[in-house]
Amino acid sequence: MQNRIYWNNSNNNMQKGIALATCMAIVMGLFTGCGNKNDQQIAASPDEVQKGRYVETELSLPEEWKDKNISQIFRSGDELHFLVAGGAEGQVSLEEWMLGEGDTLTEVTKDWLKALPDGKGLESRDSFTLLQDAEGNQYLYGNCYRDEESSSAHLWKEADGSALDITPQKWLEPMDMDGYRFYDTPQYVTLTEDELLVGLSYFSLDVVLAQDGSLVSSQESDSLTDSGSLSDNKWVSAVGDTLYLAQADEQGNVNGLLQMQLDGNNGAKSKGEIPFSQDSYSSAYFSVLGDGTVYAADADGFFRCDAGDTNWQKLLQGIDTGFSLSDQWCRDIVALSDGSVYAWFGSESGDKIMIYRYDPDAVTEVTEELTLYTVEESFFLQQAAVQYHKQHPEILIHVDAAISMTDKYSGNADYQQIYQDLNTSLTSGNGPDLMVMDHLKLDTYASKGLLLNLQEILQPMEEDGSLLSNITKAYEETDGARYAVPLQFGLLLAVGRDVQPEEMSSMDAIAKAVSRKTESYMGDRTCGELVEEFYPLIVDDILQNRQVNRDTLRPWLEDLKKIADNCGILPSRKEGRAANIWDLGSDVKLVLQETDGFNEAMMPYAVAELLNANVVSMENAFYPKMVIGINSRSEHVETAKEFLRFALSEELQSVDTYEGFPVNAKALETQAAADRSMAEAYTTYDIDGSTVEFAIKSYSEETANHLTELCRAATLCLKEDTQIETSLTESLQAYLNGQASVEEAMDAVEGSLKMYLAE
């Protein structure tokens, strides 16, 4: 089945990545192609001081907002307005505020809005949108989700100083889809100059009369685009009689801004398109001025497209904005005619309003630029580069990712080609300053003298207890040198239903346990899937003195055969996937779960609670994450060292980016004690043929402390070698099918690795 999931969080940036990582239906790069984004400012010569640029500052919010939530930022006339929600549960109060000269905030709430909440059972966390027509009449839309049994939509209009409910009947009537009851309620609403309210939901674009809420037209949202779909944030804006909607490609990246014309009862028709190329981990946000000028922002920067044009000018680099930070997420942006742009960010510490204004006297400060190469796109690394630049404005760290999150989780990554390309770059002297080398054979780089010894950085931090030395010493050479260090790590957890902890604490224990069972405990597997799951346990020991270590290989093969006999080996997988934690309630009894951090651990522990299952750390094993090294030939070695110290610091590592546990000891304690309520999610789960509601909720303090101890006790580093994995997969098919002996299997492995060992 396809599980529905509802996140108790508006962190679009991070959830876009999580969606790929967990296959849940929710969560950097350069802009290319049509609608190119060009730097607005002409580059100065090296001897010139370049003046004039956009500058980011934070708006100071009034003390009266301390216990309230911003529900909306919007433009009224040519002034920035805020809708703020507060008050006790079930008796929410709404206030309208205006930003004036000197960035002062003044309350301008009309009487009808003050009287609105009586008896409505609203909450300050609900989503509200305030709209105003040319005559000053106001309308309020509330999206107030409570449960699947009632509609979340409410639409009121100002009428003689009080609120008149004009919610369209369509939004109040339940719909059925594959047995699920739901309401097709708008995520965004906007108001046209003709006093038509337009609501955009996941399924439809509705046009209603602002006068009484009667439905004028309704059309499927999928019909609005010729290719792709509307973007995830379901944004719509009206300027004059033109609607603007963001279109996305199959990966969810915005690739165009659609311009639609309302045509009476026929709904919206295409009027034009402003191309917008995006390959960024964050959602894109837009604001359209009355003259048709469009402002856009995402993690790559701030951009402007003049009215009637289709080319975008870059106003500010993404690294100089809050959009590049993974511990906060944008809710909306608003541009004014003077060129200033305001961005509303949410964070665990509350709302933030960032201001972007052009300062003709501001000087570009960057004097040193470094490149941080990473095999895989990463929130943590982007956060590190942004934060370091904020502390050191004269230094800019460019993060260059070989593989986007989309490619990583689609299985399109060619790590061997990436390894060869990086090797060529390093040996030619054109390599990056810092490298994150996950999935690559970094021993090769170290043996060629291409990596700097990091011992002088790591040893003092380990000796004073700043780092988890059980993790950071994973790449220590026999002579004590260290050419790489993991910035984060994941735990290998085994989750078993009707399986005792001691029966899944190691590969050997699993092999013994399942060999006594007739029922398949892990579900059928192909040879490659089984090898992929278990080969990291021995990859570091399988080769010794450029020969296959048969003493290590034999017991691993014998255990693998026992597990294969219980699973059942498929010749190939033509459809579907190998069983995972979503199948523990029905098809399998045991799964291995790579768990990358405290937030990610909510999933296996929630499943265990739901199924009364057990969770253990398998073999005290960990996956090294973001294994970083410094190019010994870099012209910026000292700066690279300082950046690495910063990347290992408590300050940076205390934020959980869903990519791993921190190697900083104090950050580990900070994350363990963190409030995880914003990461909670609600979905459904299959148990023995029945579908039940499933809450992925924060676990207890006891569990958090237990996870901390597992992190401190982890000793077995699970490394990767794609060549060894391929050789094992090619060599073991006959053995796992019972057509070859263990001796023959070892001979086949040796033969397959002969050329690899000769390199």
PLM regions: where:
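Short, well-ordered beta-strand elements
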Residues: E365-S378, I395-A402, L434
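Repeated scaffold domains used in trafficking and secretory/extracellular systems
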Residues: K66-R75, G119-D133, P174-L191, T225-G240, ...
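Helix-loop-helix "hinge/cap" segment bordering the ligand-binding cleft or interdomain interface
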Residues: Q455-L458, E476-S572, S632-E638, S741
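Hinge/lid segment of periplasmic solute-binding proteins
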Residues: H439-L493, D508, K512, A608-V615
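C-terminal capping/gating helix-and-loop segments adjacent to ligand/active sites or protein-protein/ligand interfaces
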Residues: Y682-L757
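Extracytoplasmic/periplasmic substrate-binding proteins
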Residues: E558, K562-R645, E650, V655, ...
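C-terminal motif of bacterial Sec signal peptides marking the signal peptidase cleavage site
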Residues: G29-G33
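Extracytoplasmic "Venus flytrap"/periplasmic binding protein-like
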Residues: D400-L467, K589
